[in-house]
C-alpha cells in the first residue's frame, strides 16, 4: 500500500525463520500461541490436534476416506523434486501415505508439513520505475491483495469445515483484481495440513463444499491440471519455516509468472494467487499477481 499510494518509492518484504535450535515441545508450544488460550491450548491441544478435529469432522460430513487425501501430499512431494530450495526431495506413493505414522488421528506424518529454517524476500517498486530501469525480466504486478479474520477459537465458528476468512479475503482480492477463480492459472495455498488444502480450494471457489478431494483424485491439482497448487512443493514438501512461508509463496508465484520455474514451469501462466493462513484460519491474506 505504501508503494502503491506513492508514499514510498520502494519497499522490501522479508520473511525469516529459525526453528531448528529449539526442542520440539517448545516449538509446538510457541506455535500454539496463535490458537485460543482459554479453551484450546490450556488443555494441551496443539495445531496438529486442532486440524485433526477439523479433518475428522470433514470426513464425517462429506463421506470421504482418509486415503482420499493422499493426492495432496503426493502432488506436493512430486513438485518439490525439482525445487532446489525444498526441504523434502523424495517422491511418495499412496502406499507410503497409507503406511505413514499416525500423529493425531486422522492426520498422519504425510498429512503434515515440516517446520524448519528459511528466509525469502521480495522487492516492491512502482511499475514506472521498472520500465525506466530497462530491466529485461517480465513485469509482475500485484492486482489484488486482501486480508480477513475469523474467530481464533475453532469451536466458535459457525462451521468448522469452512474457512470463512479465506472465502472473504479471496472475494475481496478477486474484486480488486477484476478476476474470478476461472481466471486464476495456479494457486499457492497454505497446505500446512492436507485438510487445509481442501478447505482453501473450496473457500476460494475452485471446488464446491466437500468436493476438493475429488479435484485432487482427478489429478486437477497437478502441474497439468485445471488448478495447479503448490507448484514448487508447498508447505508440505518445500517446508514451512513459519515466519518466511508467506514470502516464499510470493517468490514462487513470481517465478512461475516470469517463466523461471524450471522443470515445474506452467504453460502460459499469466495470473497466480497465493494465500497464507494464520492460526487455524483466524487470519488469512490473499494476493493475486499478474504478468504483463
Mark where each language-model region is.
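Short glycine/threonine-rich loop-to-helix capping motif typified by GTGT followed
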Residues: 154-159, 191-214, 225, 241-243, ...
Amino acid at each position: 500500500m505504501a508503494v502503491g499510494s506513492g508514499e514510498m518509492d520502494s519497499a522490501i518484504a522479508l520473511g525469516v525463520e529459525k526453528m531448528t535450535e529449539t526442542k520440539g515441545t517448545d516449538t509446538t508450544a510457541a506455535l500454539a500461541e496463535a490458537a485460543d488460550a482459554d479453551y484450546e491450548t490450556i488443555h494441551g491441544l496443539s495445531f496438529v490436534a486442532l486440524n485433526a478435529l477439523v479433518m475428522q469432522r470433514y470426513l464425517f460430513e462429506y463421506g470421504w476416506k482418509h486415503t482420499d487425501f493422499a493426492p495432496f501430499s503426493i502432488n506436493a512431494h512430486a513438485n518439490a523434486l525439482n525445487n532446489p530450495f525444498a526441504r523434502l526431495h523424495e517422491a511418495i506413493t499412496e502406499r507410503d501415505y497409507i503406511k505413514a505414522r499416525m500423529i493425531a488421528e486422522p492426520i498422519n506424518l504425510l498429512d503434515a508439513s515440516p517446520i524448519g529454517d528459511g528466509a525469502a524476500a521480495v522487492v516492491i517498486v512502482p511499475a514506472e520505475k521498472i520500465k525506466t530501469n530497462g530491466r529485461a525480466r517480465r513485469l509482475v504486478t500485484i492486482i489484488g491483495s486482501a486480508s480477513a479474520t475469523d474467530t481464533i477459537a475453532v469451536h466458535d465458528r459457525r462451521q468448522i469445515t469452512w474457512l470463512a476468512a479465506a472465502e472473504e479475503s479471496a472475494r475481496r482480492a478477486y474484486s480488486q483484481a477484476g478476476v474470478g477463480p476461472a481466471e486464476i492459472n495456479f494457486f499457492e495455498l497454505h497446505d500446512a495440513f492436507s485438510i487445509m488444502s481442501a478447505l482453501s480450494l473450496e473457500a476460494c471457489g475452485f471446488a464446491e463444499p466437500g468436493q476438493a478431494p475429488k479435484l485432487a483424485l482427478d489429478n486437477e491439482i497437478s502441474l497439468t491440471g485445471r488448478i495447479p497448487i503448490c507448484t514448487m512443493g508447498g508447505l508440505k514438501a518445500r517446508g514451512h519455516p513459519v515466519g518466511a512461508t508467506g514470502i516464499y509463496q510470493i517468490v514462487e508465484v513470481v517465478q512461475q509468472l516470469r517463466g523461471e520455474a524450471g522443470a515445474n514451469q506452467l504453460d502460459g501462466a499469466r495470473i497466480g494467487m497465493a494465500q497464507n493462513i494464520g492460526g487455524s484460519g483466524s487470519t488469512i491474506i490473499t494476493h493475486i499477481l499478474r504478468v504483463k
